[in-house]
C-alpha cells in the first residue's frame, strides 16, 4: 500500500500539473492563477518526454500575461526542455515579441545555447526573421547614444564616444557561433530576411565569418562559407546587395573551392548572378536599419527600476499618459520633453520604425505627438524606484497562501481562493489554504506560522533539482512524519 500510495500521489500531482500546462497553452489566465494559488510549485512542472514546462508552452503560444504570472510565481526563467531550449528561445522562434520583452525585463539569459545545434535566442530570431525580437534581445548592449551608428561603422572620430559603450561585447554577442560555425547573419542571409540582415550589420555582424566542419552538422553549401555564400544559396538579391555593400568578398572560396557565384549557379539562383558577377562601379550607400532602436536601453532600465505596470492617476495634479489616457506619466522623452507612462514608452521602442521619423539620428524613433526624434527617455522626478522587485519574493507570498496581505505589492497570483473555487472543485484544499497551516502538496512537510521564517527545500514534481522555498513555520524542529519514512523503507524493498 505504501508504493501504491506514492504512485497515487504522483498521478494526482501530474494531473494538476497537466491542467496548468493546458491553461498555459490555451491562455486561460484565470485557471492558471487559481492553480498556482493552490500549489505554486506547479510552475516548475514539466511534461514527460519533451519536458516542456508551462513557461515554455505559454511563451511558444505568445500568452505574455501567463508568462509574467509564472515568473512572478517563482519559476526559473531559464528553465530548459529536453532540447535545452529556454522559453526565450521558443518566443524568438515563433516571433512573440511581447513575450520576449517580458523575459528581457525579467533578465532572462540570452547567452544560453540549446543542446542540439548550439543556437542562442538570437539565432532563432534570425532564422525566422523576427526583427522586433532581435532588437529586444540586444536592449542591454545598444546604448541610448546618438553616436552609436557612427561608432559601429567607424565614422566617429571622437574617442570619448567610442569609450561610452562596449562595442566589442556587442560584436561578440552578434557574431556568436552555433554548431558548424554558423552565425545569426548566416541564417538570416540564407532565408532572405533582408531587414534582419540589415539590423545585424548595424549591430556589428561580420561578413567574413566562415563556417567550419566540426562533424556536428551537415553543410550542403560547404564548410568555409561566408554569409554571402549562404545568401547566394538562398537566392535573395537584396541580402546579397546588403552584404556586398558591407564589404563581403565576392571571390571568397569555401573548402569546396566554390565562390558565391558558383554556389548560386549550383542551386539555380539566377536572380543573384548579376549581382555576384562583378562589383558595381557605383558604391551602394549603407543606410541604417529602420529597426534600430536607441531609446530601448534607457526605458528598459527605468522599467526594471520603477516597474512597468499600470499605475492609475492618483490625483488631478498628475497628468495621464497622452497615449493610453489611463496611466500616470513616469518618463519623458529627451529633446521634446513629452511625457508618457513606462508601458507606452516600452511599446513605442519595441514597435516604432525609425523610417517614419524625420531626418535625424540613426536609430532614433519619432515622438507620436510632435514627430521629434527620441534618442533616450529619462525618469520623472516624481517617479520613485520600487523598493522590491515583484518577482523576488513571490514564492514566499504564494507558499504563505495569502499570509503576505501586508505587502505593498500584490501580484496577479495573489487572489482570493474563493473566487475560482467553483472551477476547481477542490474545496477541501481551499479550506486548508485559508487556515494558518499550509499543505505543501506532494511533500509530507507540515507547516504552520510563526514570527520567524525557516528555509526548507521542496522537491518539485517534474524538476530535476530542488528549489529552496520559504514558508511560515510554527515549530523550528520540522521533521518528516514516521509514515513517510515507513513508505520510503517499503519502497526501497521493491527496488
UniProtKB/Swiss-Prot annotation:
Entry-linked InterPro entries: Ankyrin-SOCS_Box, Ankyrin_rpt, Ankyrin_rpt-contain_sf, RING_XB3-like, Znf_RING, Znf_RING/FYVE/PHD, Znf_RING_CS
Q: Which Pfam families match?
A: Ank (PF00023), Ank_2 (PF12796), RING_XB3-XBAT31 (PF24921)
Give me any GO biological process, just one: protein ubiquitination
Q: Name one GO molecular function term.
A: transferase activity
> Does the record carry Transit peptide as a key word?
no
Could you list this entry's UniProt keywords, alphabetically sorted.
Answer: ANK repeat, Metal-binding, Repeat, Transferase, Ubl conjugation pathway, Zinc, Zinc-finger
Zinc finger feature spans (RING-type): 321-371
ANK repeat start-end pairs: 50-79, 83-112, 117-147, 180-209, 223-252
Tell me its EC number(s), please: 2.3.2.27
Q: What's the top EC group for this one?
A: transferase
Q: In which pathway does it act?
A: Protein modification; protein ubiquitination
Reactions performed catalytically: S-ubiquitinyl-[E2 ubiquitin-conjugating enzyme]-L-cysteine + [acceptor protein]-L-lysine = [E2 ubiquitin-conjugating enzyme]-L-cysteine + N(6)-ubiquitinyl-[acceptor protein]-L-lysine
Q: What is this protein's record name?
A: Probable E3 ubiquitin-protein ligase XBOS35
